């Protein structure tokens, strides 16, 4: 399933009267407001993919935008980004054939670990920075980076992390200024909530939020009332609460401060962040913080709340059932793959189906983290230098 550049949409959108003549649908991985994602085996090769099935009636009036954005996604090729492999069209459906992920979700892996350190978090963030830097060089802004969109490539202990879900991604330039309020509450940058024009810096803010969560297990901004939550984000005031941050290095906190900087012009870029000692040096500590972080993840990101349309563990379950286990990683054909098109709103195209933040009822994209704020505070940061 080669992806080539310079093609018209008609040449890369393959016609299929009956998709099931090409793929054998194995199992439903998830459903959303506009689509269904299924585990599918390509009959000609035996390769496994995740196929997102979108009824054309859901696309009505949005065809042009969707085609433009799919064309953008087809240009992306990076080892830490889930790939769009192919596109089929039938009289009634559009089918997006995605790389299939088999390693499960980020939070699951952290909770299941017996040992987890700052160094582990630093390694994760380094991979995210590398992938997002690639996107930014391509002129693409993801706009919905969050832990739920970070998946493991395989079951392997040293598996790389993959960025998924480009439902809200957007190309910079071409004369248009990004100003649509979209993303997931709790991870969006202040300038997005302020409805100001914004840039790729919004992704860097989100990476800072993710790094924060990876080091303590709860989000930097929390309130059961969305308006108050947005107020906190707009002010960029967050805390390094005791006792949760007592064993975290000053270098890690400095790294987060530079990404969660209120002023996007002063905020670290991906390139700057990748050069920070916490990423590029030896300042990330090797002390085991698993007990504290995993306990907070269990408390604040309950599976039933933060898992949305795509259930990555269904892939693992199905593979085990088919006894594909060890052959997956060694096979050059079948499943060296990964997926997730599951965004909170199951968005289909960046410019057409952005979820307006003001209408969201969830907190931080996980339904609601019902975490009481710790009463002892070791440090408060205003998000502005």
From Swiss-Prot:
Modified-residue entries (Phosphothreonine), positions: 180
Q: Which residues form a coiled coil?
A: none
GO MF terms here are: ATP binding; calcium/calmodulin-dependent protein kinase activity; calmodulin binding; protein serine kinase activity
Family annotation (SUPFAM superfamilies):
Protein kinase-like (PK-like)
Annotated segments matching region Autoinhibitory domain: 279-319
What residue stretches are annotated with the Protein kinase domain? 23-279
Q: Which SMART domains match?
A: S_TKc (SM00220)
Q: In which tissues is it expressed?
A: Widely expressed. Highly and mostly expressed in polymorphonuclear leukocytes (neutrophilic and eosinophilic granulocytes) while little or no expression is observed in monocytes and lymphocytes.
Listed A to Z, the keywords are:
Allosteric enzyme, ATP-binding, Calcium, Calmodulin-binding, Cytoplasm, Inflammatory response, Isopeptide bond, Kinase, Neurogenesis, Nucleotide-binding, Nucleus, Phosphoprotein, Serine/threonine-protein kinase, Transferase, Ubl conjugation
- Location of the Glycyl lysine isopeptide (Lys-Gly) (interchain with G-Cter in SUMO2) covalent cross-link? 113
Control of this protein's activity = Activated by Ca(2+)/calmodulin. Binding of calmodulin results in conformational change that relieves intrasteric autoinhibition and allows phosphorylation of Thr-180 within the activation loop by CaMKK1 or CaMKK2. Phosphorylation of Thr-180 results in several fold increase in total activity. Unlike CaMK4, may be unable to exhibit autonomous activity after Ca(2+)/calmodulin activation.
Q: Where does the record say this protein resides?
A: Cytoplasm; Nucleus
Q: Where is the region Calmodulin-binding?
A: 299-320
Kindly state the positions of the motif Nuclear export signal in this protein. Answer: 318-324
Result of altering residue 180 to A: Loss of ionomycin-induced activation
UniProt lists the family membership as follows: Belongs to the protein kinase superfamily. CAMK Ser/Thr protein kinase family. CaMK subfamily.
Domain notes from UniProt = The autoinhibitory domain overlaps with the calmodulin binding region and interacts in the inactive folded state with the catalytic domain as a pseudosubstrate.
Stated name of the protein: Calcium/calmodulin-dependent protein kinase type 1D
Q: Which organism is it from?
A: Homo sapiens
Q: What is the lineage of its organism?
A: Eukaryota, Metazoa, Chordata, Craniata, Vertebrata
Gene encoding this chain? CAMK1D
């Amino acid at each position: 399933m080669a992806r080539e550049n310079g093609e018209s949409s008609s040449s890369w959108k393959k016609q299929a009267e009956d998709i099931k003549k090409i793929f054998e649908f194995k199992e439903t991985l998830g459903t959303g407001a506009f689509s269904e994602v299924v585990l599918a085996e390509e009959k000609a090769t035996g390769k496994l993919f995740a196929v997102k099935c979108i009824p054309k009636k859901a696309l009505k009036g949005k065809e042009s935008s969707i085609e433009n954005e799919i064309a953008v996604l087809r240009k992306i090729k990076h080892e830490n980004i889930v790939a769009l492999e192919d596109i089929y069209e039938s009289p009634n459906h559009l089918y997006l054939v995605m790389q299939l992920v088999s390693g499960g979700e980020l939070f699951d892996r952290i909770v299941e670990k017996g040992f987890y350190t700052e160094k582990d978090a630093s390694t994760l963030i380094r991979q995210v920075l590398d992938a997002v830097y690639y996107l930014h060089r391509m002129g693409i802004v993801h706009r919905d980076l969050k832990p739920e969109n970070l998946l493991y490539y395989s079951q392997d202990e040293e598996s790389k992390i993959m960025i998924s879900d480009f439902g809200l991604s957007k190309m910079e330039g071409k004369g248009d200024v990004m100003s649509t309020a979209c993303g997931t509450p709790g991870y969006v940058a202040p300038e997005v909530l302020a409805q100001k024009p914004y840039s790729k810096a919004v992704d860097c803010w989100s990476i800072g939020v993710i790094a924060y969560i990876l080091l303590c297990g709860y989000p930097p901004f929390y309130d059961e009332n969305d308006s108050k939550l947005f107020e906190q984000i707009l002010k960029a005031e967050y805390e390094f609460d005791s006792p949760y941050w007592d064993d975290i290095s000053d270098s890690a906190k400095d790294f987060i401060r530079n990404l969660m900087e209120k002023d996007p012009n002063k905020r670290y870029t991906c390139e700057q962040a990748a050069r920070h000692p916490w990423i590029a040096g030896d300042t990330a500590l090797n002390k085991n913080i698993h007990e504290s972080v995993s306990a907070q993840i269990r408390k604040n990101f309950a599976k039933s709340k933060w898992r949305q349309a795509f259930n990555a563990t269904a892939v693992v379950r199905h593979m085990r059932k088919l006894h594909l286990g060890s052959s997956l990683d060694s096979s050059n054909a079948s499943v060296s793959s990964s997926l997730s098109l599951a965004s909170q709103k199951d968005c289909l195209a960046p410019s057409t189906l952005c979820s307006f933040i003001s209408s969201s009822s969830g907190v931080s994209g996980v339904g609601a983290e019902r975490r009481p704020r710790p009463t002892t505070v070791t440090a408060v940061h205003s998000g502005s230098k």
